[in-house]
């Protein structure tokens, strides 16, 4: 019988941007079992809802995660609006969607850079993050912040994004597109990338469904599910698009899905800017939720489905705020994907799942 050993992977590791710890049970240089451990950056953000005015808590909700900050802000505000039975103007919905899709581009370009860095393709890492910088500049010019945008509030937006600024966003994305397409071509067609990604960390569609995998991780295994199309967080009525789905279920397929979603997000933004309404941006509400009033919403974050739940208690403070993030859904898929793989491929597989531990632990 081959000798088995346990190798600790993380929480501090050069290839991981966040503190995920795995105990890897190894036999003959292959992973037999992966046991995840989280809890290193738990901050108790949900508990803080009992001590903060629900409008003040919007700042905290946006800080659940830096990469997905605008998504968490939209999710929290939308859940509170449902609890208070507020219907925001169409322009608010459009601007939130535009910012959310910009966040998706930002997240995927950041991830592509980390993936390139993981297999030693530093030039590709620089190219990915150079393009990402253009999205951060858009955020800064329209909202004042590069990461935390602080534009959403319960009932609408704190300030408008002018039509001239929206047109500038489209111009920037049009200028970026050739470079993005060249970047995607390198990732998907270059042999040095393909050899590291093809056939690694395979998860079948059947397993993906049984493990309730979400986001690009699930769609790369053939799961045709995108909240933007099929759930109460959908905005397919605002723009025409279809979910990006691959079938191989390996690291290459996950890269394929995210690469396609970058250019798809550009198309969505361009369409939204072309038909955005001019019916105002709402504003902060003075309503107080009734005791026991509830609101919930599901949105498609860059990493997958995120669920937001709020409950009022008759005061300005919320009684409960709950978030279920995509990484918590995908951890079971991660441990499954690692079974039987070579130890050298572990960092690659973890990165293609794109875990966000800050979101997961809160």
Regions found by a protein language model. Give the residues of each.
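Active-site bordering "gate/hinge" segments
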Residues: 1-362
